[in-house]
């Protein structure tokens, strides 16, 4: 479990975030009946941009949870399907669970409080594995952090410094080689929140794009899009 350069950040703030995320995870588990809670409790963790948001005194839009193994994933999906009230378009299922509404899609489960329209929790079941394995595929380094409720531990990918929690610069994770078009399309989302991206980071994405995408038309579309965005 990595805490590279943790002395460069506010340790008390990290402890405060751990305490907050412990409560978030407990609330999340309490949505489920005891049988499912028992199967989940040591097999899930939280990861992604919510940790960066909390460190920078912002309220996360939602909390993304991940599962460590396929057996736990199957148990969870089987249970949720038993709570389903409506199916739509094959992979989409809608249901209710302990005062919450949920929507299951091919890749994720979104859980929403019944009297709200904003997402509260997301379970990303497309990607399964340990925290280090999963966050290795995240797009930018400020997102490559996780919280393990089992250990009450906030850590980062083994290659990522805790200094990335403090910066407003987007730093591309060049370990990633999937959905690179999606990475580019998400750039305006980050820049609209006050983050910046330097030309060298755009260059890293384009170099990776060159190696991972074989369709020349797709590459051209991406380059045209970057041009229209002023990159």
Name each region found by the language model.
Residues 1-231:
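Catalytic cores of the polymerase beta-like nucleotidyltransferase superfamily
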